[in-house]
Amino acid sequence: MRKRQDHRATNAGFIFVNDKCNPRVAVVDLHDFVTKQIVGSELIASEHGATFVTPDTDYVVETSQYPAPLGGAYAPIEQFNEKYRGAMIFWRFDKEKGRIVPEESWAMELPPYMQDLADCGKKVSDGWVFCNSINTERAYGGILEGKPPLESGATQNDMDYLHCIHWRKAEAVAKAGKTTTIAGMRTIPLQTMIDENLLAFAPEPKSPHGVDITPDGSAIVVGGKLDTHATVFSFAKMRALIDQKKFEGKDPYGVPILPFKDSIRGQCEIGLGPLHTQFDNQGFAYTSVFIESKVAKWSLKDMKVVGKIPTHYNIGHLSAAEGDTVSPDGKYLVAMNKWAIDRFADVGPLLPQNFQLIDTSGENMELLYD
């Protein structure tokens, strides 16, 4: 779920909610809390990295999760590498009418990795979007054929790929007609993405999950999930490498790959299972630590953890006051907890998750309310 945004902060006129199972996006008007519109495309079969909005809410971004033949066509799983693909859809949002305009929307074809969460650049990184991926191994299971199960096959590589996409330039390419229409959606082919220098990869530690851009837009924080670090990518470094075409190689589809060490500002040792990150107005980041069931507070400047607070359950997402905008409010954070462990509120067997309100205004985080 994402609110409408502008360059100042958040414009709370609408929220956009994605449906992971049936790839579609809903527009909810916050003036009356009524769902005004639901749109979807048969281009993709599933999604996860939605809904993220560009600054000024020109577009609502929806990213596929599981690769599939685009447009719902059939291809045997043995043709996974050749026929299966991911995609990212840019739904045009008319702010005056409060509606998505499908005929002004477009998409881009991506390699058949499992694209995950995404975030749009802001301020210095405005015009770019960054998307995590897992399963650069392109595993699809096959135990009966002697192949490793999907979960094992998809975690063989030490690095996956952070997708760095120049969406503003891609918009111009789409408007120039360099697209192919698939299932009614204008789509920039993968080869065109490469030829027009719209897409580059930066290696990121194994099976990452959260990707979150700092309030000033200068850095991209990636939660390791199967790595103990939060990796801080420097937008300035990556942009310079892309402009100078300093790549360490290409992926099997020809997408250029940036050198990892030259792309990052550093790494912060967070703990076991770092996922998502939010920010305050004092230069601190807050990362959910899934396996430890804690929230870690750490300094963006020093890249050192300054404190942790335990949560009820295995924490997944977290949300700070305006914590993903250009001007975070600070003071409060909500831990969104997933699975019941140890002590928990008796809210029934179907919904064991709960939220916790945490005060972040002081030197140490303090639990205010379960």
Give the location of each predicted region.
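Predominantly soluble domains enriched in secretory-pathway, periplasmic, or organellar proteins
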Residues: 1-370
